[in-house]
Amino acid sequence: HLGAMSTREGSPLRVNVGAASADALREFGESVGWEAERRARLADLLDVAEPLAHHFVLAFDLAEGPQPRVGLECYMASAPGYGDHWRLFLARLTDAGLCSEAEAGALLEWPGRTAGAKGRGRLTGHARLADFLGTRHPGAILRTLNHVKLVSAPGEPRRAKAYLVATRGWLDLTP
């Protein structure tokens, strides 16, 4: 997909290219004529992520041609708490110097749920639905780790950024 990055210098166009394999992204870089240095930086990010990520999104900006920064969004096959994918991936990022053990630990603590509190006053749509569904289907805020983006730019250290999600959901407590 495409996005207008109007708040960034030069107002570049962000291009996101999804792929189920690292090889597909390597081939993409070659097929669009990226120079060897940019392909090498992409390969470096893929080498970190490939063994554990389920699928990828390559992100780069276009202004008057491709901008130097390359981003690689890494998605896991399962949510944290339902396997070791995220724990292993974050350990790999720690080993690669892309995050600290404390940062990885904090990210692993994020997933979960927070049961909604019954408020006073006028009921919102969510509160009315919770009342209708009853105690076996309480509302909650569901938290998960969506993806981690690895970023590489010439002359800068590689970086990792985490993208968190918090959504309103309904729990099923029926026996």
Enumerate the predicted regions with their spans.
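Internal, hydrophobic cores of structured domains that mediate oligomerization or house catalytic pockets
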Residues: H1-V32
